Amino acid sequence: MKEQDILENQNWLEVWHHYYDPELELEPNDPNAICISSVDSTGMPNGRYVLLKDVSEKGFLFYTNLKSQKGKELFVAGKGALTWWSRAQNKSVRVQGTVEQVRDDIADTYWASRKEDAKISAILSKQSDEVASREQLEEEFAKLKAEYAGKDIPRPKHWSGV
């Protein structure tokens, strides 16, 4: 695809894949890292990095703690933005749009694919809150790991896809 063809293309998904797909082969370190931007109640913008998990005609999908500052801001505003940068291609893509939470069955399916430690970390994480100490966090982690040993770990309702 020539640069002019890309700029004139009305199919956003085709344009996305034109840049994103080669990056999966070219960049060994988190080629799916995206910066999600939201605004707080005063209109101050906030950006943070998350890992993109899927792209389809429905949009871009990542998972997060809905009680985090990011989750709250995205849903209060009902819209957000993402920026993705390709180191290998020296290109960036900006996207703006509305925000929706995925259905529970979609979040549950992805949750089931996660490793046990990642699930426990998601349960423990109180994003945007200060942690008393690393030792306390490690103790709580060990306690939950023992509690869930050999059991299914349920997805917390505040953890979902956006």
List each model region and its residues.
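Binding-site signature for planar aromatic cofactors or substrates
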Residues: 1-162
